[in-house]
Amino acid sequence: MTTIIPSPMSEHPTVKALAGRTRAGAPEPLTLEAVRRLARLAGADDCGVVSLDHPDLTEEREPVLRAFPAAKTLVSVVVKMHPENVRSPARSVANQEFHHAGGKLDEVARALTGSLAELGHRALNPAMAFPMEMDAFPGRTWIVSHKRVAVAAQLGRMGLHRSVIHPRFGSFIVLATVMLDAEVVGRAEPLTFDPCVSCKLCVAACPVGAIEPDGGFRFSACLDHNYREFMTGFGDLLEDVVESRDKHELRERVSISESASMWQSLAYKPNYKAAHCIAVCPAGEEVLPQFLSDRPGFLREVFKPLVHRDEPVFVVPGSDAEAHVKQRFPNKTVRHVRSSLRSTSVEGFFRAMPLVFQRGPARGWKGTFHFDLDGHTATVRIADGTLEVLRGLEGTADVTISGEGQTWLDVVTGKRNAVLAVLKRKLRISGDRSLVTRFAKCFPR
């Protein structure tokens, strides 16, 4: 016969009180319409649900379950913005709209989480933007990709500008995700068309040429400029402060207005430097009529004020972005900065290469590079403006680079001299070394 020894906790008044209550049954199953109704009552403008097992969310599954192991369904929540605020050439107005809409969205997601809890369901709402898991920086700091979830939930399609375009509200939306511990009965009708109208205004408006007409996207160009006053730009500013000999050199590196702008972002939430691509987008049922009824007027009142705006544009020296702004926007002021993407591991270096690759310096030649750094291997092929990164060593290399991973990372970030690293046998480089110089120009720092 088993003797049950009472736990000290069993004598606690709260435990005793709960023991006397009738245990509640399982909560009622949730339907799509019920979730939508709760979301709208919380203040959402639209809402969709998608299973965490959806094939398009494979990359999201692990980080979502790490944050909320009970997650089974993701609820995508939409709050719309006021287009005229976002379009204003006074970018402080646009940034205030981003901040206000984002703040409202976090409140909506939190309220929805509370409503679901009242029905007996566990739910969690990560921030629509910040705070993030900065201990993981410069790796993945976000818990869930709100954009990816929204597309999988049939709330829109990804545009050329890499923002979700909602069929009704267009690009003027902010997104959040609520994680839910239950399956939801019912799914939204598939979105059968792309809300993008292929006007390419986002391509023409981007000051750094991050959006290419063929669908390509220069990630680093967007990050270096538009997100200048976020994590990486702030770090770059600190390095300028440390490296400057005196206040006069600091002023040569960082203007008074740039210092004030960074202070403003630190004090009143970070501000975007552009977001012109969203501002000029005419897509969406509620937005498109203005463009269709008066295209010249739309270009005159919305597009041209942003394109002709005198503003600093932050670019890495030798980058495609620098060449673009000098050729396309001579009225704008080029400001040189360090690359925002700096790898802290060999695997991170391999993953980041497609994000920082510059097509301009890669045109007109080709080469195959083998990397073997602390046992981490990769094959990199550059051919007339294109890049291919493969794990492992494949084919015949024109150049082989091997040795200590940290030494290579120090060379890439400018902390060490490559020649000295080779002389000290920290690195080994074999093959056509002239290609190494060409390789470096494709990844300016």
Language-model features, listed with the residues they occupy:
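Non-catalytic, usually N-terminal nucleic-acid engagement modules in DNA/RNA processing proteins
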Residues: 2-106, 110
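Short secondary-structure junctions
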Residues: 41-46, 121, 360-362
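Catalytic cores of enzyme domains
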Residues: 58, 94-95, 100-285, 293-301
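Short glycine/proline-enriched loop/turn "hinge" motifs that connect secondary-structure elements
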Residues: 65-70, 165-172, 393
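Conserved hydrophobic/aromatic beta-strand scaffold that supports enzyme active sites
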Residues: 74-76, 175-177, 280, 370, ...
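Short, acidic Gly/Pro/Ser/Thr-rich loop/turn segments
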Residues: 82-84, 172, 185, 288, ...
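Short helix/loop capping segments that flank catalytic or ligand/cofactor-binding pockets
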Residues: 85-87, 174, 188-189, 290-291, ...
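Feature captures hydrophobic
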Residues: 302-303, 308-445
